[in-house]
Amino acid sequence: MGKTLTIVMLVFVSMAGWMFGADTGSIGGITNMRDFQSRFADRYNPVTDTYSYSSARQGLITGMVNVGSMTGCILSSPLMDRIGKRVSIMFWTIVYLIGIILQVTAVPSWVQIMVAKIWTGLAIGALSVLAPGFQSEVAPATLRGTIVTTYQLAVTGGIFIAACINMGTHKLHKTAQWRVSMGINLLWGIIMFIGISFLPESPRYLIAIGKDEEALDIMCKNNVLPREHEIIQTEYHVIKTDCEAEMAGGPATWGDILGADIRYRTFLGLGVMSLQQLTGDNYYFYYGFEVFEGTGMNSPYLSALILDAVNFGCTFGGLFVLEFFGRRMPLIIGGVWQSITFFIYAAVGNRALTRKNGTSNHRAGAVMIVFSCLFIFSFAQTWGPAAYVIVGESYPIRYRSKCAAVATTGNWLWGFLITFFTPFISDSIGFKYGYIFAACNLCAACIIFLFAHETKGLTLEEINELYLSGAKPWMPRPENLGQAAKQQQEVLEKSRGVQGESAAHLENVDNEGMEDTSSNDITSSTSSSEGRAKPESNYVDEQDRYA
């Protein structure tokens, strides 16, 4: 398998995000479809011949997928440690398909809809841990941010396509209105299952469990290089040495993720993923129909479609933003931008939307839609993709599955709290709710400035060194970091220049003491190069960093 094909297949893994987005994007429109309301709503107004939901039922139907997702995040870790990421992804995809079938057959019980949402959420939550983690481990360091961003791109693509499907089905008759929107999600799961079946396991995982030969074969195929090549040798020995050091203490327990060497990153990942929800994006995506109806828009389906199109289109920018500008700056600027847009949205909605005679001010409504789109413009390129990138690349392999599970669980917890309580809060304070999200976005920008390191261009092993180095996040990172990645890139460029010459004839690029890799004994464990040496005096426990 060549590198290009590897990248294409890694994008297939992003179908996990598409499945999540399709669920998020469809439920808001489905709950507003006439046939669905007639079967599952608990209120009926005979005067207007309309159905509606109590706040509790609305929150349960919409938000219970997040409860399942929280559980799925935790369950993903032990299964992944046993059978690996690739097979785990295939297993959870089957769980997802069963959940969709349960949703489509849920007539006439709204409880079955709720249970089916929980079941589907199990798969969505597990895949939200597995997919970005798998991409981070297999992707080249220079492309990791872009490739992991495809997960969020797939989320927004799923949301947009679901909105298009809702737009086309909401005028159909009887159960076809909502069953088509739900049932088409089976297609995404099938595509995901087929795609992942062709993808190899993560070399890092294989080395961690002692399958070095298989890992080497995959590394050679991914890079289209022989085993003796310097890139393969360097990458293998770096991963091997780090895996041995990390696994020396045995498999990590849940308590170990609070140890001195990883505690800081455990809470950072949890905080970043929680703050991603607290930015308020799902306020629009889950309740966009109610929001736009409140602004006086005649066609909430069309309004939601416009917002979802902006979300999807702008996420393409995120593919480049995180590689060109790094992780920190986009998150900081994004948080400030989103705070401003939410503040204006809330102020206009609270003060200008409703006239004294009770009618809606359509100009004010248009302003609110514009600032909603400006919020999405920022979120789609910053907090949407970057949160998954940070979680996917911040943890060493010994802790990765459990730390990522905890971080993503925080995301789903806040997702549930926001989706469940939004109907109650909106009924109580209306558009003033936006002030809360404005404050959360500003807080998020401050937390990134104080606690998150810039990791652009570093290998996963170098990121681990960075977090252990004691460097302040807002200061320039240590100069010795990133040398291995640069050396590998130099070797790759030279290997392309000689069009397949033997590695023995390539110029030796290891000027920093990188180990000689010409030996045939490539599976023996060797020390890292001097450029990657870790003097004890340069490293501190993470909890002492800000002492």
Curated annotation (Swiss-Prot):
Pfam families: Sugar_tr
Biased composition (Low complexity): 517-529
Top-rank taxon, per record: Eukaryota
Residues spanning the membrane: 87-107, 113-133, 145-165, 180-200, 305-325, 329-349, 364-384, 405-425, 433-453
PROSITE patterns: MFS (PS50850), SUGAR_TRANSPORT_1 (PS00216)
UniProt xrefs under NCBIfam families: SP (TIGR00879)
Gene Ontology MF annotations: carbohydrate:proton symporter activity
Phosphothreonine PTM positions: 523, 526
Cited CDD domains: MFS_HXT
Transit peptide region: 1-21
Principal subcellular localisation of the protein: mitochondrion
Example GO biological process: carbohydrate transmembrane transport
Mitochondrial intermembrane-side positions: 22-86, 134-144, 201-304, 350-363, 426-432
Stored InterPro entries: MFS_dom (IPR020846), MFS_sugar_transport-like (IPR005828), MFS_Sugar_Transporters (IPR050360), MFS_trans_sf (IPR036259), Sugar/inositol_transpt (IPR003663), Sugar_transporter_CS (IPR005829)
Name under which the protein is recorded: Probable high-affinity hexose transporter ght8, mitochondrial
Record localization: Mitochondrion membrane
Keywords noted in UniProt: Membrane, Mitochondrion, Phosphoprotein, Transit peptide, Transmembrane, Transmembrane helix, Transport
Sites of Phosphoserine modification: 519, 527-529, 537
Membrane topology designation: Multi-pass membrane protein
Family listed: Belongs to the major facilitator superfamily. Sugar transporter (TC 2.A.1.1) family.
Keyword Transmembrane: yes
Organism for this UniProt entry: Schizosaccharomyces pombe (strain 972 / ATCC 24843)
